[in-house]
Swiss-Prot record:
Signal peptide: none annotated. Its EC number is 3.6.4.-. ATP binds at residues 96-103. GO terms for biological process: recombinational repair. It comes from Helicobacter pylori (strain ATCC 700392 / 26695). Keywords: ATP-binding, DNA damage, DNA repair, DNA-binding, Hydrolase, Metal-binding, Nucleotide-binding, Stress response, Zinc, Zinc-finger. This is DNA repair protein RadA. Residues 351-448 are annotated as: Lon-protease-like. Pfam families: AAA_25, ChlI, Zn_ribbon_LapB.
Amino acid sequence: MAKKTSLFECQHCGFTSPKWLGKCVQCNAWESFIELNQAQKEVLNTLKKPIPQAQKSVSIAAIEHEEVIKFSSTQSELDIVLGGGIAKGGLYLVGGSPGVGKSTLLLKVASGLAKNQQKVLYVSGEESLSQIKMRAIRLDCIEKELYLLNEINWPVIKANIESENYFACVIDSIQTLYSPEISSAPGSISQVREITFELMRLAKTRDIAIFIIGHITKEGSIAGPRVLEHMVDSVLYFEGDPSRELRILRSFKNRFGPTSEIGLFEMKEQGLVSAKEASSLFFSKEEPMEGSAITITLEGSRALILEIQALVSECSFGSPKRLANGFDTNRLNMLIALLEKKLEIPLNRHDVFINVSGGIKISEPACDLAVIASILSSFKNRKIDNKTAFLGEVSLNGRILEAPNLNARLKEMENYGFLKAILPKKPSQKTSIKCYEANAVGKIVEWM
């Protein structure tokens, strides 16, 4: 008689072990292992089996290839993020917090494609058909070629996709679907992994662009096994406060284009719309205030004008606070230490708070100079002209380094009527912006 083998799986990350573990060695989750039954083990073994290869290896120079066919999503900002549009046969995963606009955006994409006489299927496991139609009426998304399906049974959904010649498909959401062949609840690791694998095969074999909406965990990552993100061609993530109009779409993985671009949307009565004059969303045009400084950051090929806001106040307790929203806290601590060392400013007795307007997160060092200028402005209670921008990276020895692609930043300043720029070196090309050189942090204090 064959010996019975057991297999346990972590419900957080999908890690498998031949014995039960109190703590997952991969994701460090406690008491997350459950024993798989025979059917689940067969599915797992099927997924692990390599696809047999009949052909021999071929020289890469001898392989004939075709360019990836892309088509417009009808949403200009989404096309920018995807690198020029949706690829035929592409599998896209879209995540974001509840209410941020995932379903709204993809319903508008589906409607836009259907308007161009393309047959599109929208599968919802969360809303009834009448609820979806009410939302479609509000968003003006009623199209004859847009088909709705309210179903969570995966074999039924798969049969529907295979029975019709759909151009694209939207799954809302992957965590609500289940396959009867796997005896676990919808949204479990096994269910999500198997159904995503089937969707990947459908997308490639039938040349259908498929969008999957994914829920997120309380830590902010997409719920489900990590293999989910490896299976898909692109991972898109919505950022933004649901209570505000602005939404930012980022690409964390894209097999068909760059991952450095971002898309900017505004939530209006007619749903998510591509933001016009994007830079104007991130800075104030009102009278200048203490603690505010302007900078220009690059997100992919796009230059954005941002307002850095600082608040410096006397410390009420022994240990001062350093908090940043949209800016790296470790880099903020470094800049504060630099001001204390080089300029002898007693920030060790002050709380320092930094905020990047618009809710955007910046990581490029070229914004360092604006952060320092905003801190000095708040500390000295001096206003900075809101037609002046600060561009430059600050090194540990107090020197200011040139921001890359400076001409693109200055051109964006010209478009919005800015007059002056503080930077370490004057630009090589002519510009209407008056550029003032400051190659060290001490020069900023003199200028202020």
